[in-house]
Curated annotation (Swiss-Prot):
Superkingdom classification of source: Viruses
Entry GO MF terms: DNA binding
Function: Binds the viral DNA inside the capsid and the portal protein. May control the DNA exit from the virion.
Cellular compartments per GO CC: viral capsid; viral procapsid
Record protein name field: Minor head protein GP7
Localisation per UniProt entry: Virion
UniProt subunit comment: Monomer. Interacts with the portal protein gp6; this interaction targets gp7 to the procapsid portal vertex.
Keywords carried by this UniProt record: Capsid protein, DNA-binding, Late protein, Virion
Amino acid sequence: MPEPQNQEELDKYLDNIITQAEKRLDKVFASRLKEIKAMINKLFEKYSKNGELTYADVVKYNRLEKEMDVIKQNISADYKTVLKMLNELLETQYVDNYLRSAYIYEMYTGRNLGFSVPSADVVQRAVENPIPLLTLPKVLERQRVELINNIAMAIAQGLMAGEGYSQVAQRVHKRMQLSLAKARLTARTEGHRVQVAGRMASAEQAAKKVNMQKMWSAALDTRTRAGHRKLDGKIINMDENFKSIYGGVGKAPGHMHMAKDDCNCRCALIYVIDGEIPSVRRARLSDGSTRVIKYIPYTEWEKQKKAS
């Protein structure tokens, strides 16, 4: 991918990094699911009678408990991997957006704006969620415990219902997919929050020497939530807050302190230098691809879509 030359291109570049992280999560969960299915198949092969395996058969001699101990250890190791993976993602999102935004501001203004590489302490403070219960380790720990309990329950319920291997494996598959979806949502939501934090920090430094305002830029497609469509194109001063119809109030997308605003938000924060808004923006087509169009607010784009 070519080097980003403006804030729109930079957002696409950073979003692609999050997408790649989501794909790595897919591989972690797919590998674990494959091993758990193999374990279930082994139980059926060793202890079933005429293809039927009862719950009593697997609890005898702690057979299921021993297998669940192994599953618990393996899933715990997986979540340590996920935590490391997501911490690296968040650090990349912050530092990349900070430095690349700094480059864009300096190239645009033709001035040295006094930027330096953020220290490890600054990055760590930015990465950590300010709400104690929503820090990455605590969120992933809740997801880990939930997944282990759900797998144990899925196997037990399937066997007590007299189901065969395929049905029990399908129960486990559904539980794993739900946990994967939560892990992906965590990566997307936290990645976006820290990504925007990097740009805000960069803009605060630039604003010491140039006139800057901030503008909400909604994702230009039909999946954008109604409240964020209304905020699209809204320009406010650096020290002001955005307010959404959902009750969120905050400095930027992903920082509205309201789950209905922040979870899986795809909006961007664009900085307006000397009152000049971007001339182009990226829109998503019906086939999922994107293209660059002349800058128009979301409401105007929506009218054009309905008329076409």
